[in-house]
């Protein structure tokens, strides 16, 4: 969803949110989140979250509060050959969902990844307080890690190694800020 009548795309959704019924406002919030992601604007993404947000996905596990925003800051800062599309944005007064596909160059191997993700949200006070992304980690590891991911990506050993590496990268990013 574009907001051509606004010079700054980030100003439109928050203004509109205050005038819409909650389910519509939550659809706008989800749209704002992914539009910011398309622009690699992690600050606008993090602004959609409550301070105590709970985020989870198969790569990072569960992140809380600032760690969730910092994950997006790290990923958007490091993004190479990145594109994102999203659709199926739905919500009611308390929950929402969306589907998104990110295509990017995985820097550790130079492989292109097309990650197909389902997202679920819980809202509180007009912001996202829970965000749970779901994707096939084996499919991701086959693309990102090549043969190693194809042969071993389904094993707990590789799954745990992916999570440990993701968290190590996040901690290093946070230490360098």
Predicted regions and their residues:
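Short, low-complexity N-terminal intrinsically disordered segments enriched in polar/charged residues
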Residues: 11-47, 164-177
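Hydrophobic alpha-helical core bundles mediating ligand binding, dimerization, or RNAP-core interactions
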Residues: 30-37, 49, 68, 72, ...
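A solvent-exposed, acidic/Ser-Thr-rich amphipathic alpha-helical stretch
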Residues: 42-46, 50-96
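A beta-strand edge to alpha-helix "cap/lid" segment located at domain peripheries
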Residues: 76-177
């Amino acid at each position: 969803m574009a907001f051509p009548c606004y010079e700054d795309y980030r100003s439109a959704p928050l203004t509109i949110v205050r005038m819409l019924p909650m389910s519509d406002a939550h659809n706008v919030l989800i749209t704002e989140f992914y539009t910011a992601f398309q622009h690699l604007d992690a600050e606008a993404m993090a602004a959609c979250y409550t301070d105590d947000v709970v985020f989870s996905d198969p790569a990072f596990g569960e992140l809380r509060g600032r760690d969730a925003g910092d994950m997006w800051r790290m990923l958007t800062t490091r993004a190479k050959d990145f594109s994102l599309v999203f659709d199926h944005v739905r919500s009611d007064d308390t929950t929402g969902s969306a589907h998104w596909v990110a295509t990017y160059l995985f820097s550790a191997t130079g492989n292109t990844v097309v990650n197909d993700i389902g997202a679920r949200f819980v809202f509180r006070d007009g912001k996202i307080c829970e965000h749970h992304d779901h994707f096939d980690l084996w499919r991701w590891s086959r693309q990102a890690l090549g043969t190693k991911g194809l042969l071993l990506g389904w094993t707990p050993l590789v799954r745990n190694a992916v999570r440990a590496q993701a968290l190590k990268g996040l901690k290093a990013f946070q230490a360098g800020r």
